Design a protein with these regions (language model features):
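Small-residue-rich segments of transmembrane alpha-helices in multi-pass membrane proteins
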Residues: 19, 44, 131-146, 198-203
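Core segments of transmembrane alpha-helices
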Residues: 13-19, 77-94, 137-146
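Juxtamembrane helix-capping/reentrant segments at transmembrane boundaries
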Residues: 61-81
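Short, highly charged, low-complexity non-transmembrane loops/tails of multi-pass membrane proteins
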Residues: 186-210
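Hydrophobic alpha-helical transmembrane segments in multi-pass integral membrane proteins
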Residues: 139-160
Length: 210
């Protein structure tokens, strides 16, 4: 599993994006827009992964160098991330077929989080504002998220409580995944977070002085 995921996780995500694109082409007229939104985002996410990991790639290495923290079981981490991707995109697409709105909102929230993550990386890495994945986060994922939220709002589908449900649906499993990856590294989660925050703050100060 470790070796397989190290080698092929990118291609699995790419295949997921290709399947999503094929579904959109075949079902654009018949599928409701509510269901199309998370599927569109799957395509956007696959494009984003291409920039982060291959063209030009290097986002994982950048984060590792900024924080000074190395992931020992990278294949396991990639498997967990792939499972989370399916959970946060494919599952909402299926639930949207039953008319459920807040899971779709959870998918769209990823587009906002991705932008914030890359802006945070830019703040820490003073030597270069760009980080691999930033262009597609800003030009692809974020516009898809904004359009999706705009469409949901104009259709009167969003209720205030949906924001809470969407956030919980997305963030609780994400934090659990992070904790599991850290645990597989042989480190308590609070120590990992403290070390990462200190390393990022130190990198930011050093970059600022330069």
């Amino acid at each position: 599993m470790e070796t397989f995921m190290r080698r092929y996780s990118f291609w699995l995500t790419t295949a997921l994006g290709a399947c999503a694109l094929a579904w959109l082409v075949a079902s654009w007229r018949s599928a409701p827009m509510l269901q199309r939104l998370p599927v569109i985002y799957i395509v956007a996410l696959a494009v984003h992964e291409g920039e982060e990991l291959r063209f030009p790639g290097g986002f994982v290495e950048l984060v590792t160098s900024m924080t000074g923290i190395e992931i020992k079981n990278l294949g396991l981490a990639k498997f967990g991330l792939l499972c989370f991707t399916v959970y946060a995109t494919v599952v909402p697409a299926l639930l949207a077929g039953a008319g459920m709105v807040w899971p779709v909102m959870a998918t769209l929230l990823i587009g906002v989080i991705e932008v914030l993550a890359h802006l945070a990386a830019a703040r820490v890495n003073r030597r270069c504002f760009y980080s691999p994945g930033m262009a597609t986060a800003l030009a692809v994922q974020f516009p898809v998220a904004c359009y999706g939220f705009w469409w949901l709002g104009t259709q009167g589908l969003v209720q205030p409580i949906y924001w809470l449900w969407a956030a919980l649906f997305l963030l609780v499993p994400l934090f659990c995944l992070q904790a599991a990856i850290v645990r597989s590294n042989g480190q308590p989660w609070h120590e990992f977070m403290g070390g990462a925050l200190r390393a990022m703050a130190r990198a930011g100060r050093e970059g600022h002085r330069e």
